[in-house]
């Protein structure tokens, strides 16, 4: 049994919904891969070939690379192959959040969250959307810290992530640094050089987090993201307090674009990149990472470029960012080989470019471990799905004909413990190193998403899945038109043939891996509703049982 699934069952998911299916794990150890063994490519030595995929393998890729598989993409991957699909996605024009907010008929508080839902469910550039969401959990800002009224600024920040999802990490780091939303969130905006008479010292907030969380981490890393140890077995620090103080001095003298006053500006532009005020910038000499010296007398922009180059070229960046992207997209516990292979692509792709996120994402998704990890390491491969992704997956699977203009699920965090750009701190909703107490921790593994899972959250997400399936399968159940109605037209056509219906739902929601026990539970429930007028009820209840099962809670 997969360890994550075992822990889910042990934490009483099924007790909260009143049923208890058995183990869904299928022994795949002796099965042949769906396509040929991995061959070397110019990007990564352990990439899978670009052959058409079986449906279950197409589903697995789409779970990793989108906000939920849809039938047309599963079928398309059965004709083309993963690399063709990835390339096509990377060429698809971006769907920007700010455009969606501007087009909204009204902009009540937190409307940007509803726009995020719309794009996650319906946008054609699914891979870009999923990568931007992953980046938003690494380069964190949050409306939860006094920015809730700055909807356009928040959407513009998210657009920076969308714009650079397949660009270069150095450019992303530059635009994130000068975002006034980031400037407000981590105190870079209005940061001043030292003035002892006024008891002013440069703020260290952004300097600390750009190093600790956004780029290199706290300790020196090998290419596989394992720590480099000293002779006593202690991890070597990547920087010290003096390093932070020097970077804090670099990050002085920036404020709103066109601000008329540095200390008390009235023109609060949360969209345009911040601009320098040289009189507030510390122009003294500084020492950065790896003892790189910054000469005295340089302006704010020149020093910023030197500092970001210094961070970007640190050897830690490749493994630090690569591992977190793997965790967000594919599996919580990637092997050292997987991380190293991807980090090497980040460090230098086939064109000799460092920091190419397009190459990095392709290396993550095309790596043998991403495609065959469920076979090679069935006990530990995979991850618990984030609550937001469990919701988008159910809505995408039964593609709604439309999303009502009055649709509102902006209060999602109170139910799911998670909302876009709303983490409780700069450390995101969960830490990449969080390890669930018990067997997971005992085995030295991590389980980030388990940090926001407990009995109460299980009940809440189950109730939300109930509302999004049984209660919302057509608009007549919602007189205000605020819910997304799943489209079960296809499923109603299949309903007379029970096996065909369950095979279809199995593919759409579980990638064809439904356990015999879960199938038996669903059949028993449908048998209990075996009267002509209950056909739609049988369908939506079957969907709910699958969507709320431990099998659907895991990405494998």
Would you name each region that the model predicts?
Residues 112, 122-130:
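Amphipathic interfacial helices
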Residues 17-18:
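C-terminal motif of bacterial Sec signal peptides marking the signal peptidase cleavage site
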Residues 1-7:
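Bacterial N-terminal signal peptides that target proteins for export
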Residues 127-131, 143-152, 198:
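Short, flexible active-site-proximal loops enriched in glycine and acidic residues
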Residues 9-13:
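Hydrophobic helical h-region of N-terminal Sec-dependent signal peptides
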Residues 27-114, 152-322, 326-556:
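His/Asp/Glu-rich metal/cofactor-coordinating catalytic motifs and the adjacent surface-exposed loops
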